[in-house]
Amino acid sequence: MTSRLARLWQPGNPQRRVFLPDFWMAVVESPSVGRNRLPRNCVKFEVDPRMSRHDIREYLTKIYDLPVRDVRTEVQMGDITWNSKLDHQYKKAMWKDEDKKIAYVFMSKGFEFSYPQMFEALEEDLELVKAMKQQEELKDKLNERYANRNRRVGQFLGA
């Protein structure tokens, strides 16, 4: 499915032409922990809404030579902007964002996907993490001074 058409006649020798589809795919980062995490061999894509499971499989196997085992798709409804959020009886929809199509692509068993690191960690972020760790340590030391103060029976009785 392409919007480009081949011309009937072109000057010169006949040439092979490849027409790629007008579809697009984008890798979506999924959480590595928690209930929404995906298996290691699964990749989450946001795809063109016109794409079918077969289109996604062919796109990844033919163009990128990936070992696709299974494709599952999901259509997520776009957010609706209401004129009045609290008035449930008379509210009207003012705007609706476009729906998204999400594809979960499962690769063969040995394949592992990790989301690429696009940017290096900033020094400010590293300093912030270091300060947070230091704050936790100080909090623990402060709590140790006050923990179980009323249970110093040994000191009280002279033992």
Swiss-Prot record:
GO terms for biological process: mitochondrial translation. The gene is mrpl-23. SUPFAM superfamilies: Ribosomal proteins S24e, L23 and L15e (SSF54189). InterPro entries: Nucleotide-bd_a/b_plait_sf, Ribosomal_uL23-like, Ribosomal_uL23/eL15/eS24_sf. Belongs to the universal ribosomal protein uL23 family. It is found in: Mitochondrion. GO terms for cellular component: mitochondrial large ribosomal subunit. Keywords: Mitochondrion, Ribonucleoprotein, Ribosomal protein. The keyword Ribonucleoprotein applies. The keyword Ribonucleoprotein applies. This is Large ribosomal subunit protein uL23m. Component of the mitochondrial ribosome large subunit (39S) which comprises a 16S rRNA and about 50 distinct proteins. Its main location: mitochondrion. One of its GO terms (molecular function) is structural constituent of ribosome.
